């Protein structure tokens, strides 16, 4: 990306370190930089901006308002498009703060351990640039709930597909269906901006069924063209409270002459615990019908091990947060390694999300992960563009 177009803020109480960060940004080509001497100063500067900056680098250990409270305010007031957590503190604490920020709905590019270097900054900032092309010109607040529900009803919300490839041979073996709102004006809205609203309105299950229906339609078309793939679809927590969901999903899949065995339903950790007894019953029926079941974002909830013991999962997805920088952060590597080892002992297929660099690929391949998904392989694309995206894919030469 053109770094000169990026606006970045540095929030750091130590003047010398703040100047180093600003100098490193200049070396990267960032021409628009803001600075704050502490949390309160940063919030004052941010509130006076005509538009939120692209990225805010926030030090955690500051006097007065610390970085944790500052990030919370930035998220609640939507004062930035993304943040990067900067600190010399325990990596486990950095991960906790990132999880908090995401819970607020704030995009987190990652964490950077001090001392800052140009390479460290570039590694996280490029993650913002990578996703700019997917965001297009969407406006985060430029739609109403009625407009969203109308869009769901008239087919504007469609699946885009991200390839999944085997580490062993580099072969594309599946895709994940990811919702996108293709608006009449040509803009594309990411799911993080509208899925929470659908969940609040009790319509998220309708989105799941649409992704499943359209995904199977494409799966059938690709199969006719000689591309045999599996389809992964995220399941709304609402579905797990509905005893009839398993029958509906089976009917949708089979209406396209697709076997349930070619479909993997991704379940987040928290969704099962909403109504454990009913949820376990629905999952058991789905598995009985042949659907694969994936525990999504493994390790980010509070009941991972209990879930694995109770639910007949066939797949474990390692969360992108653990994958990012696992090659350079021993704690993250340990989490990934332990997750993969546990999955092997339970005879589960393993999928690593957020594989974005050759270093990510190399580490996960060494640790024995089954399948990779991420921007290194390909970004989510409309169904019509998937064959070309697969044709462009080349397995990294290690």
Residue ranges and their predicted role:
Residues 6-7, 15-34:
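Two-component/phosphorelay signaling modules centered on CheY-like receiver
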Residues 57-59, 319:
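Active-site residues of response regulator receiver
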Residues 69-76, 89-110:
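Alpha4 helix (beta4-alpha4-beta5 surface) of REC/receiver domains from two-component response regulators
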Residues 203-278, 354:
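Catalytic core of bacterial c-di-GMP phosphodiesterases, primarily the EAL and HD-GYP domains
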Residues 12-13, 35-44, 67:
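Helix N-cap/capping motif at the beta->alpha junctions
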Residues 137-197, 295, 373, 378-382:
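Active-site core of bacterial EAL-family cyclic-dinucleotide phosphodiesterase domains
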Residues 60-64:
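The short loop immediately C-terminal to the conserved phospho-acceptor aspartate in CheY-like receiver
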Residues 111-122, 237-239, 266-274, 291-398:
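EAL-family c-di-GMP phosphodiesterase catalytic domain
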């Amino acid at each position: 990306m053109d770094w000169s177009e990026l606006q970045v803020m540095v929030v750091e109480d130590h003047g010398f370190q703040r100047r180093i960060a600003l100098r490193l940004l200049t070396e990267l080509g960032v021409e628009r930089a803001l600075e704050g001497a502490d949390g309160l100063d940063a919030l004052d500067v941010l509130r006076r901006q005509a538009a939120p900056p692209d990225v805010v680098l926030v030090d955690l250990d500051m006097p007065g308002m610390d970085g944790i409270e500052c990030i919370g305010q930035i998220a609640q007031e939507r004062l930035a498009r993304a943040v990067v957590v900067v600190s010399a503190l325990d990596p486990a604490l950095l991960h906790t703060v990132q999880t908090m920020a995401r819970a607020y709905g704030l995009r987190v590019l990652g964490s950077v351990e001090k001392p800052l270097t140009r390479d460290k900054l570039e590694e996280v900032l490029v993650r913002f640039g990578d996703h700019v092309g997917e965001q297009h010109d969407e406006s985060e607040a430029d739609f109403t709930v009625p407009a969203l529900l109308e869009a769901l009803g008239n087919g504007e919300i469609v699946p885009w597909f991200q390839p999944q490839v085997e580490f062993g041979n580099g072969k594309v073996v599946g895709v994940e269906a990811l919702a996108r709102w293709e608006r009449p004006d040509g803009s594309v809205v990411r799911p993080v901006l509208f899925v929470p609203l659908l969940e609040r309105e009790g319509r998220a299950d309708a989105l799941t069924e649409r992704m499943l229906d359209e995904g199977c339609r494409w799966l059938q078309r690709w199969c006719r063209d000689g591309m045999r793939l599996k389809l992964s679809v995220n399941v709304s927590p609402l579905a797990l409270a509905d005893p009839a969901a398993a029958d509906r999903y089976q009917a949708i899949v089979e209406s396209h002459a697709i076997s349930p065995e070619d479909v993997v339903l991704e379940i987040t950790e928290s969704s099962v615990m909403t109504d454990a007894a009913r949820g376990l019953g629905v999952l058991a029926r789905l598995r009985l019908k042949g659907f694969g079941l994936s525990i999504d974002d493994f390790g980010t909830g509070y009941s991972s091990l209990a879930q694995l013991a109770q639910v007949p999962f066939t797949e474990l997805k390692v969360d992108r947060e653990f994958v990012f920088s696992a090659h350079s952060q021993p704690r993250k590597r340990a989490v990934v390694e332990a997750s993969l080892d546990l999955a092997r002992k339970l005879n589960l297929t393993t999928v690593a999300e957020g594989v974005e660099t050759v270093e990510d690929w190399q580490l996960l391949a060494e640790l024995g992960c089954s399948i990779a998904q991420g921007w290194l392989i390909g970004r989510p694309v409309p169904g019509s563009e998937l064959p070309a995206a697969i044709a462009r894919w080349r397995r990294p030469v290690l």
